[in-house]
UniProtKB/Swiss-Prot annotation:
Complex and partners: Part of the 50S ribosomal subunit.
Family (UniProt): Belongs to the universal ribosomal protein uL4 family.
Bias type Basic residues, positions: 60-71
Listed GO CC annotations: ribonucleoprotein complex; ribosome
GO biological process: translation
Name this protein carries in UniProt: Large ribosomal subunit protein uL4
InterPro entries reported for this sequence: Ribosomal_uL4, Ribosomal_uL4-like, Ribosomal_uL4_dom_sf
Functional description taken from the UniProt entry: One of the primary rRNA binding proteins, this protein initially binds near the 5'-end of the 23S rRNA. It is important during the early stages of 50S assembly. It makes multiple contacts with different domains of the 23S rRNA in the assembled 50S subunit and ribosome.
Protein's UniProt keywords contain Ribonucleoprotein: yes
UniProt gene name: rplD
Lineage: Bacteria, Bacillati, Bacillota, Clostridia, Peptostreptococcales
Length: 207
């Protein structure tokens, strides 16, 4: 069973915590992680890319010159894809790129992502995190105490506007709730900081 240190907001180790083997100690499946990230990025795509085919470009209905006798290559329209201002071959059209990933695959990917953070010593547990009023400076000091100076994903057990607003102005810092964490965000951040109560909720929800 994985065991990690628990820190306070001053960066001092206050205790240790055993994590669930079923969530934070699984075998990391890189292929499943790849599929989950690919799925998330595909679902984010707007799918609004569009270009005109030769049939859709305005003009070009008249043959630019006669077929024979000019010495030029034959041409039937000035909107051929070979011409400047012509249509696009196999022009992209708006479409929905999203697709559904099986629930079991999503669960396994999330567990693999969390396990990878534990294995790489990039997961950090806080005994508690609470702010009465939004203050970016306080959040900066907390992260500094925890040596979290790069991209940080901060996960809390309950929604706290003061914490969210305090972290929102810090470059590279993202806040999330237990039910909103995802594989891409976990892997895309260097540090995964989670409160003790949030760990308990993760183990309860994803067990």
């Amino acid at each position: 069973m994985p065991k990690v240190a628990v820190y306070n907001v001053s960066g001092q180790k206050v205790s240790e915590m055993e994590l669930s083997e079923n969530i934070f100690g699984v075998e990391v499946n890189e292929h499943v992680l790849y599929e989950a990230v690919k799925n998330q990025l595909a679902n984010k795509r707007q799918g609004t890319q569009s270009a005109k085919t030769r049939a859709e470009v305005r003009g070009g209905g008249r043959k630019p010159w006669k077929q024979k006798g000019t010495g030029r290559a034959r041409a039937g329209t000035i909107r051929s894809p070979l011409w400047i201002g012509g249509g696009t071959v196999f022009a992209p059209k708006p479409r929905d790129h999203s697709y559904t990933l099986p629930r079991k695959v999503k669960r396994l990917a999330l567990k693999s992502a969390l396990t990878s953070k534990v294995n790489n010593e990039e997961l950090l547990v806080l005994d508690e995190l609470s702010l009465d009023t939004p203050k970016t400076k306080d959040m900066v000091n907390i992260l500094k105490n925890l040596n979290a100076d790069k991209k940080v994903l901060l996960v809390v057990g309950e929604k706290n506007e003061a914490i969210i607003k305090s972290a929102s102005n810090i470059p590279g810092v993202t806040t999330a709730l237990v039910n909103t964490i995802n594989v891409y965000d976990i892997l895309n951040h260097d540090k995964f900081i989670i409160t003790k109560d949030a760990v308990e909720k993760v183990e309860e929800v994803y067990a």
